[in-house]
């Protein structure tokens, strides 16, 4: 059973594609839980929704390629511009004027774009484990070559288009080990693996290519244009996107940084209580 | 002493009538606190100001008729419009654009009018125990229906000799229905009687409280967020008024169940947290860059609090902490401590929590409470109430942020008291350490002091009966025999029986090992003491309170020297007494500070000291003859320490009041260098205490 059921389940059509969204609760402000990379869908917010719906209202939607929204094998469908348009369409459809954004990992891209381009609709933005191209790759990821063909890829060599298309479950298995560096994460790994296996390697390749346009220059430009408050939450032991990325984003946006010492890349599922309380404190502050 | 002094005081003068106020500077939002003058003044906020001033900018007015303000007798000068103008003038004078206004009782309508007339200046209102006509008042304000006592609310009576005091004493008794409110009662009566009946009569006459209709209209015009705090057993203002006011203004309502009319005085911790939460809600709680460590990633951490009254606690606590670290090498210990404890901790390389700088000084308070050779330590502790609550709030913030597994409080009165008063705030395991149990009255305090000590003991006993889970372990530094044979007073149990049931015994903790007899000659030589001289060390501890005793002993010196020519007297004055202010005499040396004083004490031929536990027990452990003079009115030194020393057959108790230089000289010559038959002082105390604590980790 879910902890709570949606108040509204809807589908909004945006430029000919259908975006599925859910609204939980009636309170103000709305917390817009952004989709992240296609690896998982909106269920990854399952530990946040009931709590946020009780204090505010929670709004979430699936991105392309995984979950109940449209799918595509065209990289353009996965650009940050497309995600931002989906988000605005969902806000319109749910009749939400202003929201607090919460985004995980590469949702920082569309989060930053929404914050910069729709200042009237964004009260504040929480970036959890943000993936932003502000720092060099983590040392262990320097072996990764997305377009190469490895016979028997190991470790981050598995972050590779060919491998995803040939042995997607193996990549998922590997990545889960890097996302959840905290001991005793079996349930979180099972959940995320299940969501990941609802899509396929082909789609993931397209989604990854779609993100390429979000380079350092774009990041800095959009971060500078936005004005609303920012909170960054980043695990000290994040083995997917280093803690330095979160710190750099906080600095760039003038936001506050909360470090989860001992935390990995999915702190919202692994330390949901602390993350929920941080989101609430932040939302209370920006919505007063 | 106050927990914190204002950064500035100011006066607004409107047409020659002056209203006094205090300012506590801070970058945060401004809070304007309005007391219900002329029944009381700005000091009524003493329990909450020290803490709020760490988070907000504070403006505290005395209100007309009280404190530092003028006492106009024309009722028209007390009219609501005039009060409103005074408050605006104050805000103008301080350049305050917007403020959150906190008001109590009949100051609440003033705050509401300010918010209604100047909505742009009032961010929010906290109304505590509001006196406002939105619901019926208690019958006892109606002369025809008033129960006994309330008829003292009578202007004619107030104008008679002692009449106003009668009313005030009755009234504050009614305001504090909570048991064990003696200190709040004394404070309230004292502040009320700071002013004369005529000023209060003028204030009442000019009060111009809104009628029921006016009050409802006033509420309807308010737009700012509000918080109403009201005690369920408020005998001055019925809680129905707070409830109705909250309905009419769409305010947050917090009913304090079991509280009377003065929750900010009687439950300061709760009220501070409510006000802080409200202000943060309306102004935004600042998010701060910080680290939260996952539970599994945390090292075991302890927060150690060591009472700063005397240095004895510091040394024994360092000894216990060292033993604790041998039992749990991974344990990180932070100290929340203040001077002079921090000097010992710094020398030992211990880690002092940075929030320590926020602590209000307990030792300065104790010094301020001392005169001559006298320190009424029970009353001094009572009068330390606002320092204790301010320091507790620092502590609470530290434990909430620091995720400590364990708190050890060596006579940390603030933690022990306020965790029992606010048990939901407890974090982690908690150890209470003390070397005495039971407040005892001094005989010359009469029945009233016995009533007070009994009341304090009863409150402590009730605390522990009701919330046995606040003290996870209570350790008595000593053995069962060291507990005094008295009772807690009244119908309360015998102290020793109760302590046996509620404490574990560690044995005495010296914090140092006394030298073996064969080591003594070498130490004496190193310290410059010859075999053929009688070395008498006179020491009075670190506070300024020792001057009177030193003067008397120095006066005895020539007499003693005459009878004992080999006498050499070393007087150690401590940092607060200037050695240059004593007469020069052959064989008499006056020093301000002596490094490792305990070494001197442990090899001297005689010591003359006050009645403090640590120094006397060091002498007992080192088997030195000594004279000790308990401080006047210091129940701990006069009863608890003396009882313990007698059990060890150690030292000779002297009465400062009756002991003249002749007596002192005679005792010095009689006892210097004489063998003693003291009972051995245990040396395993720190280890035993550490074991008792370590079991909790």
Task: Label each residue range with its predicted role.
Chain B
Residues 507-606, 657:
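Donor-nucleotide binding loops and adjacent catalytic segments primarily
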Residues 136, 157-213, 218:
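Conserved alpha/beta-hydrolase catalytic His-Asp/Glu region
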Residues 440-444, 448-544, 574-576:
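A nucleotide-sugar donor-handling region in carbohydrate enzymes
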Residues 222, 228-230:
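Short beta-strand/loop motif that positions the catalytic acidic residue
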Residues 112-116, 122-157, 628:
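Flexible "cap/lid" loop of the alpha/beta hydrolase fold
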Residues 13, 17-71:
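Conserved HGGG/HGGXW glycine-rich cap/lid loop of the alpha/beta-hydrolase fold
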Residues 60-106, 273:
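Active-site loop/oxyanion-hole signature of alpha/beta-hydrolase fold enzymes
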Residues 331-382:
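Conserved nucleotide-sugar phosphate-binding/catalytic loop shared by glycosyltransferases and other
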């Amino acid at each position: 059973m879910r902890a709570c059921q949606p108040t509204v389940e809807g589908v909004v059509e945006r430029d000919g594609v259908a975006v599925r969204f859910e609204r939980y609760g009636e309170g103000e402000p709305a917390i817009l839980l952004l989709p992240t990379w296609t690896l998982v869908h909106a269920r990854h917010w399952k530990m946040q929704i009931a709590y946020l719906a009780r204090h505010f209202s929670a709004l979430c939607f699936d991105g392309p390629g995984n979950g109940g929204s449209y799918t595509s094998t065209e990289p353009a469908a996965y650009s940050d511009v497309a995600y931002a348009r989906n988000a605005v369409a969902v806000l319109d459809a749910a009749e939400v004027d202003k929201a607090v954004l919460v985004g995980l990992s590469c949702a920082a891209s569309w989060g930053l774009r929404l914050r910069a381009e729709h200042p009237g609709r964004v009260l504040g933005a929480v970036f959890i484990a943000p993936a932003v191209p502000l720092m060099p790759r983590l040392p262990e990821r320097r072996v990764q070559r997305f377009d190469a063909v490895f016979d028997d890829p190991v470790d981050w060599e598995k972050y590779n288009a060919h491998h995803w298309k040939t042995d997607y479950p193996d990549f998922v298995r590997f990545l889960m080990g890097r996302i959840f560096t905290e001991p005793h994460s079996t349930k979180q790994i099972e959940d995320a693996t299940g969501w990941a296996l609802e899509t396929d390697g082909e789609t993931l390749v397209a989604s990854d290519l779609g993100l390429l346009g979000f380079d350092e220059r774009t990041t800095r430009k959009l971060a500078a244009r936005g004005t609303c408050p920012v909170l960054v939450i980043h695990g000290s032991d994040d083995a997917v996107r280093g803690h330095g990325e979160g710190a750099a984003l906080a600095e760039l946006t003038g936001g506050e940084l909360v470090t989860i010492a001992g935390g990995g890349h999915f702190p919202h599922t692994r330390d949901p209580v602390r993350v929920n309380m941080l989101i609430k404190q932040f939302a209370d502050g920006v919505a007063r | 002493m106050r927990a914190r002094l204002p950064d500035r005081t100011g006066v607004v003068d409107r047409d020659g009538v002056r209203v006094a106020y205090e300012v506590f500077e801070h970058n945060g939002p401004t809070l304007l606190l309005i007391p219900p003058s002329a029944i009381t003044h700005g000091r009524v906020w003493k329990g909450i100001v020290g803490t709020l001033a760490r988070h907000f900018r504070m403006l505290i007015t005395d209100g007309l008729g009280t404190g530092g303000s003028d006492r106009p007798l024309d009722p028209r000068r007390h009219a609501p419009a005039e009060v409103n103008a005074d408050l605006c003038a104050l805000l103008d004078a301080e350049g305050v654009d917007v403020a959150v206004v906190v008001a109590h009782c009949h100051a609440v309508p003033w705050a509401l009018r300010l918010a209604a007339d100047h909505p742009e200046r009032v961010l929010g209102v906290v109304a505590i125990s509001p006196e406002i006509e939105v619901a019926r008042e208690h019958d006892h304000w109606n002369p025809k229906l008033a129960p006994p006592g309330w008829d003292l609310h009578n202007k004619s009576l107030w104008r008679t000799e002692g009449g106003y005091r009668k009313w005030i004493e009755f009234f504050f008794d009614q305001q504090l229905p909570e048991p064990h409110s003696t200190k709040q009662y004394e404070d309230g009566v004292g502040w009320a009687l700071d002013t004369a009946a005529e000023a209060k009569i003028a204030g009442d006459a000019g009060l111009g409280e809104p009628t029921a209709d006016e009050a409802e209209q006033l509420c309807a015009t308010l737009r700012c967020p509000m918080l109403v705090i009201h005690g369920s057993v408020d005998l001055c203002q019925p809680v129905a008024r707070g409830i109705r006011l909250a309905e009419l203004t769409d305010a947050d309502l917090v009913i304090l169940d079991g509280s009377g009319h003065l929750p900010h005085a009687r439950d300061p911790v709760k009220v501070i947290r409510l006000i802080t939460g409200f202000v943060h809600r309306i102004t935004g709680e600042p998010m701060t860059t910080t680290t939260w460590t996952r539970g599994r990633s945390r090292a075991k951490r302890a927060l150690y609090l060591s009472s700063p009254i005397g240095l004895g606690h510091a040394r024994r606590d360092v000894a216990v902490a060292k033993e604790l670290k041998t039992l749990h090498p991974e344990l990180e210990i932070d100290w929340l401590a203040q001077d002079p404890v921090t000097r010992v901790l710094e020398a030992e390389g211990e880690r002092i929590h940075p929030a320590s700088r926020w602590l209000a000084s307990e030792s300065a308070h104790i010094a301020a409470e001392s005169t001559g050779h006298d320190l009424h330590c029970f009353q001094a502790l009572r009068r330390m109430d606002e320092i204790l609550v301010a320091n507790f709030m620092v502590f609470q913030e530290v434990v909430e942020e620091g995720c400590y597994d364990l708190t050890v409080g060596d006579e940390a009165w603030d933690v022990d008291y306020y965790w029992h008063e606010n048990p939901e705030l407890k974090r982690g395991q908690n150890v209470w350490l003390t070397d005495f149990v039971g407040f005892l009255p001094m005989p010359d305090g009469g029945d009233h002091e016995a009533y007070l000590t009994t009341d304090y003991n009863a409150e402590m006993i009730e605390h522990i009966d009701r919330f046995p889970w606040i003290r996870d372990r209570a350790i008595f530094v000593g053995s069962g025999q060291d507990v005094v044979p008295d009772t807690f007073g009244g119908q309360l149990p015998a102290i020793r029986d109760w302590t046996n049931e509620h404490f574990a015994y560690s044995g005495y903790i010296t914090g140092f090992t006394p030298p073996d007899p064969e080591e003594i000659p070498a130490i004496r030589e190193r310290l410059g003491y010859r075999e053929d001289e009688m070395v008498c060390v006179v020491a009075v501890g670190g506070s300024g309170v020792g001057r009177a005793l030193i003067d008397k002993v120095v006066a005895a010196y020539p007499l003693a020297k005459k009878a004992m020519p080999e006498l050499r007297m070393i007087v150690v004055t401590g940092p607060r007494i200037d050695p240059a202010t004593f007469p020069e005499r052959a064989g008499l040396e006056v020093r301000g500070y002596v490094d490792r004083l305990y070494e001197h004490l442990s090899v001297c031929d005689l010591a003359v000291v006050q009645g403090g536990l640590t120094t006397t027990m060091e002498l007992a452990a080192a088997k030195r003859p000594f004279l000790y003079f308990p401080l006047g009115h210091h129940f701990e030194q006069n009863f608890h320490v003396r009882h313990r020393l007698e059990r060890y057959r150690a030292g000779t108790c002297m009465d400062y009041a009756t002991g003249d230089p002749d007596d002192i000289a005679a005792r010095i010559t009689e006892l210097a260098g004489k063998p003693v038959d003291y009972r051995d002082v245990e040396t395993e105390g720190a280890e035993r205490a550490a074991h008792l604590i370590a079991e909790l980790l």
